[in-house]
Structures are given as structure tokens and as C-alpha cells.
Design a protein with these regions (language model features):
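A bilobed periplasmic-binding-protein/Venus flytrap-type ligand-binding module shared by bacterial periplasmic
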Residues: 130-135, 175, 249-260, 279-280
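Early extracytoplasmic/lumenal segment of secretory-pathway proteins
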Residues: 21-86
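Periplasmic-binding protein-like
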Residues: 125, 189-194, 200-201, 232-256, ...
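Short beta-strand->loop
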Residues: 94-103, 119, 148, 218, ...
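Extracellular/periplasmic bilobal clamshell ligand-binding domains
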Residues: 298-337
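Mature extracytoplasmic/periplasmic domains
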Residues: 255-313
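Extracytoplasmic ligand-binding site segments that recognize negatively charged/polar headgroups
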Residues: 29-36, 72-215
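A ligand-binding cleft/hinge motif common to bilobed small-molecule-binding domains
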Residues: 82-86, 212, 217-235
Length: 337
């Protein structure tokens, strides 16, 4: 029976080893349950042992960058697309044109074309929040429908959002607000929001999990993560902000210098198939799959039902822009937390 490992935390690293035929070193930036489901299913149908580590998008980018001269990773699957685009921009990933590209939605193909085929879209998810209806009722708070509502003084200490340095979800939120409001107004908003934030988490999905457990009133997350908590029976209501919101194109990239390149391409092609993407709802995944023939869960949000901004993936995935926003956030928001 094949085995794989899951390791949590930015310090996790694959043990240096000589790559062997039939091995794949994989970083997974989806929820751990989804990571395990995908790896188990791939191993069941392929003669490949997968060594898997689960890292958030920001952590995955940092790991791949730190190991650029001696890559320990072959393939990075899932996580929001901006860090994947930055990795492509930095030459940390290599081009690959899968024979399945013609099967994908336009938004997934656009991710590939923007990066000169160094990354590709594997799913889409919309930014919003989930709030605990019991906490809101107990405090006499109205349902938060808009970004502006999150500045209500009654929400002091009730909001959680991740740190954009480690979380692709939170970076998407940061870039969304900048595109929606303009940079100066967005940072002014984030400073005011900080008065209501109890914690900047490492993981993008952690805020709504805290809200589900009653440890926070509201988590700013991708809406599919909030749907997952509601489907598990927690008192979570899911909201798409009225002013408009951004979205992610969860992506996949082959690391430049990947030792197990053939295995990486095999996984890459397989995970873009409708068969593989149809496995996602079984793991409680409510993202929108990138293969046009894949069937999304009936609980998944439809992009056409939400007011989306025209998210500029090329600009906000570009190294200079992304680093500027992260540095400013660290100086003005994170340091005051």
C-alpha cells in the first residue's frame, strides 16, 4: 500500500533525498481534507508514491523560492493564483501545456496564458465572509451585507481574517479592496477594520472555522469555505459583499528544475480531468471546477450570481505590485495588530 505524509506549518520541508522513479513531491495549498482525497485517489490509479506537504499559498511560494537552487518540490497544486503568478514571474516554475487545456473554462486558460503556461487554473472561488448567526442575534447585530458594514463598532473583536503574507485568501482580499476602492482608501479601510479584528490567522480558511466554533463572529474568507462550514451544520450564513468582490483562480504549477518531471506532468494532466475534479465535492469542496465537463456541487456558488470586480490577475500577481502591497500591509496593518 502506498503512503504519503502531511506536514503542517511553514517550517515543514521534504527530507532531502535522491528522487526515485514513481515518486512525486507535492505541495498542496487546499484544505487538508481535499489534499488527502486527491492524493489518495491519484495513488490508487497510478504507480506513483506522493510525498505531500500541506502549506498555505504564501508559505508554499516562500518554500519554493528558498529552494530555487536545489528544488525539493516537483509540483504545487491549489491555493489562490496570485502567488502562483508571482512564482511564474520570478522564474520559479516552468512552462507546461497540458493536452487537457482545451477542456478548461476561459478563466482557467487565461491564467495559463497570463503566465506563459507556467501555471493553470484548477478551480475558482469568490471572496466574501461567513458569520455566526447565533452570535449576531445574541448581540443584536444586523446581517452584514456590505464591506462598509464590517466597520460597525458592535463588531469589535468579532472579525478574523488571515495575514496576506501567509495566506492567498487574505492577499486576494487586500488586492480586491485596492481595486475596489483605490490604494489609499483601501488602506484607510483596513486600518479601521483592524479595530474589529481579533486575530490575523495564518490560514485563509481558519477565520470562518473560528466563527463556526463560536470563537469569532465573522470570518473573511472564500465563500466556498463558509459554505463548507454551513453544510457541516454550523450556524454560518454566507455573504457576498454588496459593493462587489474579487475572486481567486486556484492554480497549479510545476516547479522549475523538478526532479520527478514525468510524474509531475502525469499528476497535472490527471487533476485537470473531469474525473479528478468530480472528486472534490466528496471532500467538502465547493469551489467551481476548471474543467467544463466536471460537475460542481449544487452547493457551489455560481459566478454569475455575484457582483464581481474585474480582478486584474496579471497586475496583482506581478512580483513588484504584490510585494509592495504586502510590505505596506505589514508596516501599516500587521505591525499594529
Amino acid at each position: 500500500m502506498k503512503t504519503y505524509m502531511t506536514v503542517l506549518g511553514a517550517a515543514a520541508a521534504f527530507a532531502p533525498a535522491i528522487a526515485q522513479a514513481g515518486e512525486l513531491n507535492l505541495i498542496c495549498s487546499a484544505d487538508i481534507v481535499i489534499c488527502e482525497k486527491i492524493v489518495e485517489s491519484f495513488e490508487a490509479g497510478h504507480d506513483t508514491d506522493v510525498n505531500m506537504v500541506r502549506l498555505s499559498s504564501g508559505e508554499a511560494y516562500a518554500k519554493i523560492r528558498a529552494e530555487a537552487r536545489n528544488p525539493q518540490t516537483d509540483l504545487w497544486w491549489a491555493g489562490s493564483g496570485d502567488p502562483h503568478l508571482q512564482a511564474a514571474n520570478d522564474g520559479l516554475t516552468q512552462p507546461y501545456e497540458s493536452p487537457r487545456l482545451a477542456e478548461l473554462h476561459d478563466w482557467a486558460l487565461a491564467q495559463a496564458k497570463t503566465s506563459d503556461y507556467r501555471t493553470v487554473g484548477v478551480y475558482a472561488g469568490v471572496l466574501g465572509w461567513g458569520y455566526n448567526t447565533e452570535i449576531f442575534d445574541k448581540k443584536g447585530l444586523g446581517a452584514p451585507k456590505c464591506w462598509a458594514d464590517l466597520l460597525d463598532p458592535g463588531l469589535k473583536g468579532e472579525i478574523q481574517i488571515a495575514d496576506p503574507n501567509s495566506s492567498g485568501t487574505a492577499y486576494t482580499a487586500l488586492a480586491t479592496l485596492v481595486q475596489l476602492m483605490g490604494e489609499e482608501e483601501a488602506f484607510d479601510y483596513l486600518k479601521k477594520l483592524g479595530s474589529n479584528v481579533s486575530q490575523y490567522t495564518k490560514s485563509g480558511s481558519a477565520p470562518v472555522k473560528s466563527a463556526a466554533r463560536g470563537e469569532a463572529g465573522l470570518g473573511i474568507v472564500f465563500m466556498h469555505d463558509a459554505v463548507a462550514q454551513a453544510e457541516q451544520g454550523f450556524p454560518i450564513s454566507v455573504v457576498a459583499p454588496c459593493e462587489g468582490t474579487g475572486y481567486e483562480v486556484g492554480s497549479m504549477s510545476i516547479v522549475d528544475g523538478a526532479y520527478n518531471l514525468d510524474a509531475a506532468k502525469e499528476f497535472y494532466d490527471w487533476v485537470l480531468s473531469p474525473e479528478a475534479q468530480n472528486l472534490m465535492p466528496e471532500a467538502g469542496s465547493y469551489q467551481i471546477p476548471s474543467n467544463k465537463a466536471a460537475v460542481a456541487s449544487d452547493k457551489a456558488l455560481k459566478l454569475e450570481e455575484v457582483k464581481l470586480i474585474d480582478y486584474d490577475f496579471a497586475k496583482y500577481g506581478e512580483t513588484e505590485t504584490r510585494q509592495h502591497l504586502l510590505d505596506r500591509w505589514s508596516r501599516e496593518i500587521g505591525s499594529s495588530g
